[in-house]
Design a protein with these regions (language model features):
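Short Pro/Gly-enriched beta-strand edge/turn motifs at strand-loop
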Residues: 6-10, 319-325, 422-423
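Non-catalytic linker/capping segments at the edges of enzyme domains
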Residues: 303-371, 398-400, 415-416, 428, ...
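Residues located in well-ordered beta-strands
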Residues: 337-340, 405, 410, 424-426, ...
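C-terminal regulatory domains involved in ligand/effector binding and gene-expression control
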Residues: 1-89, 94-312
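Flexible glycine-rich active-site/ligand-binding loops centered on an Asp-His dyad
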Residues: 173-190, 372, 442-450, 454-462
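Hydrophobic beta-strand-centered segment that forms part of the acyl-chain substrate-binding groove
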Residues: 273-282, 310-319, 385-422, 449, ...
């Protein structure tokens, strides 16, 4: 069993954003189990949290950009690649600006900072999505395609063809994530001269200089363009090296461009939110196709999880019987809707309700055609989740649980007298200040019958 990992202590780095040119202070902090990678904008009121989630991707024009409730996180891919490459699971990233620091255009400085403080194992098993079949995403407009196939470990191969004399076809491979730090982390971002001119004209590369981005000269460099570049980068002289790169940068590898594309793939696929066991093959990758592929994989994982019916021996003694449940929950019949707690961890609880014809709600819902009301299925899920949140306080009998929000409720099948409902509630984020954000599933007869995203808070009974 592989344990989840976080860092042993805080790390702070300072730099500028590549596109905004704004100075930014970034602090990595240890995070609790199942936190994943989360960003906190400490410069904004309320210090909003943005999870590293592919569903928050809004723009991939010159990097990956996330947005949640109007709050932006710009170009996180190099940092995310470093976190994955260092084998981390849980990190909080505090920022006082929207864009992460570009540093030298690679993941090198982030990896070095993480290695300086070291990692620590956490008391929870790492979740890994094992690829069982070929999954692909094709961008028909560009011909870019990413495929994952079954493999014993996470590996990545990138194939790029830029169609220019100075930078043509290149390939790069990472056979194991253990190779990231030595073979991939130091590979810097790059651009072509014609792209650089466009970016400068539109003010999209304010934090760039010739030390944090490789510039390949794919066109004749006029005196006018040379002067613009001198002014933009504050250089007295700019030259072209024999290998077609601006200024005096030395390439770390002949295929550094392909290796950096691989770095971007690793960073963008971190937005899946789960470690992958499979071989990634990326043909002409870019941030758009990378993040679309991440969304596809994340959706597949979610669908598999929601259809994964918990299996329990109902003859076995439960973790909590009805008497133990009543000692924690304030609810009483006929509104006590969970009969047993079958299992519970720090982040998940599984409960059970036997649905019988004796339920009061069947009198009117519906005469002659009894169906359990959907709202009561959601209530039963919430009561099961309430056990999880109440287990975090020493005196649960002195607390009440209140709904704050219910989202994305779906009812799949009817629940009838004689059915046995099994509820699975999983934390979507760590419990903070008595607030619990959960994903709930209800199963009956081996099928998913309902699901909902729930947010609740426990309040001490006055």
């Amino acid at each position: 069993m592989v344990k989840q990992k976080t860092i042993q202590s805080e790390i702070t780095l300072k730099g500028v954003g590549l596109h905004t040119g704004k100075e930014v202070t970034m602090t990595f902090k240890p995070a609790p189990i199942n936190n994943g990678f989360t960003f906190i904008r400490v410069d904004l009121e309320g210090q909003p949290i943005i999870e590293a989630d592919a569903n928050y991707v809004v723009n991939t024009q010159r990097g990956t950009n996330l947005e949640k409730l109007g709050v932006m996180i710009q170009t996180p891919e190099h940092v995310l690649a470093a976190l994955v490459g260092c084998d981390l699971d849980n990190i909080i990233i505090e920022l006082d600006a929207s864009e992460l620091p570009i540093m030298d255009g690679s993941s090198k400085h982030f990896v070095e900072a993480i290695e300086k403080v070291g990692l620590i194992d956490q008391d929870a098993e790492r979740e890994v999505y094992v690829v069982k079949e070929v999954i692909s995403y094709l961008d028909e407009a560009t011909g870019s395609e990413i495929t994952v196939i079954p493999s014993d470990e996470y590996s990545v191969t990138t194939m790029v063809d830029f169609g220019t004399k100075v930078l043509g076809t290149q390939n790069a491979s990472m056979k194991s994530i253990s190779e990231f730090k030595s073979e991939i982390a130091s590979c810097r971002t790059f651009s072509f001269l014609h792209e650089l001119e466009m970016l400068l004209e539109h003010g999209l590369i304010k934090g760039g200089d010739l030390n944090n981005a490789i510039v390949y000269v794919d066109k004749e460099l006029s005196n006018e363009t040379m002067e613009k570049l001198r002014v933009a980068f504050g250089k007295d002289e700019i030259s072209i090296t024999p290998n077609g790169v601006l200024d005096n940068l030395t390439l770390h590898y002949p295929n550094e461009a392909a290796r950096h594309k691989l770095l971007d793939v690793v960073g963008d696929l971190a937005l899946i939110g789960t470690k992958i066991k499979g071989k990634i093959i990326a043909n002409k990758p870019g941030h758009f196709v990378n993040t679309q592929f991440a969304k596809k994989i994340a959706k597949i994982i979610k669908n598999e999880q929601r259809n994964n019916v918990p299996v329990y021996d109902l003859n076995k003694e439960p973790l909590m019987d009805i008497h133990k449940i009543m000692s924690m929950l304030p609810h009483r019949p006929p509104f006590l809707l969970v009969d047993r707690i079958l299992s519970m961890t720090d982040t998940q609880v599984v409960g059970l309700k036997n649905v019988t014809m004796n339920e009061d709600f069947f009198i009117g819902h519906f005469p002659g055609a009894p169906v359990m009301p959907g709202v009561l299925i959601v209530e039963a899920m919430a009561q099961t989740g309430g056990i999880l949140i109440l287990s975090t306080v020493p005196d649960p009998e002195n607390y009440l649980t209140y709904f704050m929000k219910i989202d994305n409720v779906k009812f799949k099948h009817k629940v009838l007298p004689g059915d046995t409902l099994i509820f699975k509630l999983e934390l979507l984020s760590p419990i903070r200040r008595g607030i619990c954000h959960m994903q709930g599933y209800a199963f009956a007869n081996g099928k998913l019958v309902a699901e909902a995203e729930l947010m609740a808070q426990i309040v001490k009974n006055q």
